[in-house]
């Protein structure tokens, strides 16, 4: 696995005139969205999907922002690892809620992992590393009490590897009750979650128009508190040069994935900041 630097251009708040075109309390992002197949965390496996899912969903744990090698709790309050038994005993945060208002339960975690493994979509191979598959997943996840569950795995991996796997987007926790209300033909709510959300992230889905835009609105009941922004508008702008133009005109606050020519043209411009953000990437030699 390597790290790739993804250029990100931010129109800084110091340029008030440039910001006049964007709505207050709203972040406008320009990027390509044509690669998106689904925003269901059990299926999302494209760059634009993976960039969006963490705003809508949380995992039990996640890498520390300043030290990615360290795993920190999110929906989990704490955990105990038993390497010999290949088991994690996880206590959930008792006050965590989904955007629907439903409280987080062990059943939601069990449902989330079970549906991801059973649906067996593109990113399911990540959970398969634990030895989980549709034939054994039911025996690997057990509720202990209203705020505790145990996770067992069969593969020969350490608890630290298991925790890293549980920090990936496919391990996002969905609201079982909300998803169950939108199941069709035993699809675990997959068709509905392609374009809706049922998570506990800082934002929830307001509308998704494929190949056009994604609009997110603040989740006021998000664990950790509501975000400062009221909404995020992600516009589909396939052409990098057009993304650059939106930044220059003040019609976007952020432009993702600009090429070297666009970065060179904007570097040093008043009110514009170039950020290079490390991103995990897998490369295969065939």
Predicted regions and their residues:
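Aromatic- and charge-enriched surface segment that lines or borders ligand/interaction sites
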Residues: 77-123, 150, 243-246
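Alpha-to-beta junction loops
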Residues: 109, 147-149, 248-257, 270-272
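Surface-exposed binding/hinge segments that line
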Residues: 91, 129-182
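Short, well-ordered beta-strand elements
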Residues: 24-33, 77, 87-90, 109-113, ...
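Gly/Pro-rich hinge or "lid" segments in bacterial periplasmic/extracellular proteins
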Residues: 167-227, 231
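Gram-negative bacterial Sec-dependent N-terminal signal peptides
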Residues: 1-19
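Ligand-site clamp/hinge motif
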Residues: 191, 219-265, 276, 280
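N-terminal lobe/hinge region of extracytoplasmic solute-binding protein
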Residues: 30-83, 114, 196-200
């Amino acid at each position: 696995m390597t790290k790739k630097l993804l250029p990100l251009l931010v129109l800084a708040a110091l340029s008030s005139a440039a910001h006049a075109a964007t709505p207050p309390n709203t972040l406008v992002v320009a990027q390509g969205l044509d690669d998106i197949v689904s925003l269901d965390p059990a299926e999302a496996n494209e760059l634009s999907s993976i960039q969006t899912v963490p705003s809508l969903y949380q995992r039990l744990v996640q890498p520390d922002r300043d030290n990615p090698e360290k795993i920190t709790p999110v929906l989990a309050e704490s955990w105990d690892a038993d390497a010999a038994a290949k088991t994690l005993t996880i206590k959930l945060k008792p006050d965590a809620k989904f955007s629907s208002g439903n409280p987080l339960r062990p059943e939601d975690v069990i449902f989330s992992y079970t549906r991801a493994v059973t649906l067996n979509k593109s990113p399911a191979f990540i959970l398969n590393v634990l030895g989980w598959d549709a034939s054994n997943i039911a025996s690997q996840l057990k509720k202990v009490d209203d705020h505790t569950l145990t996770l067992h795995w069969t593969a020969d991996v350490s608890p630290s590897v298991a925790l890293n796997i549980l920090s990936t987007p496919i391990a996002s926790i969905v609201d079982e009750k909300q998803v169950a209300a939108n199941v069709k033909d035993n699809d675990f709510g997959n068709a509905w979650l392609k374009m809706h959300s049922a998570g506990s992230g800082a934002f929830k889905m307001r509308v998704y128009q494929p190949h056009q835009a994604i609009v997110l609105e603040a989740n006021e009941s998000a664990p950790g508190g509501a975000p400062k922004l009221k909404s995020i508008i992600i516009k589909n702008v396939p052409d990098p040069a057009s993304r650059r133009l939106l930044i220059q005109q003040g019609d976007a606050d952020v432009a993702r994935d600009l090429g070297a020519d666009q970065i060179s043209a904007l570097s040093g411009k008043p009110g514009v900041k170039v950020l290079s953000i490390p991103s995990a990437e897998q490369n295969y030699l065939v």
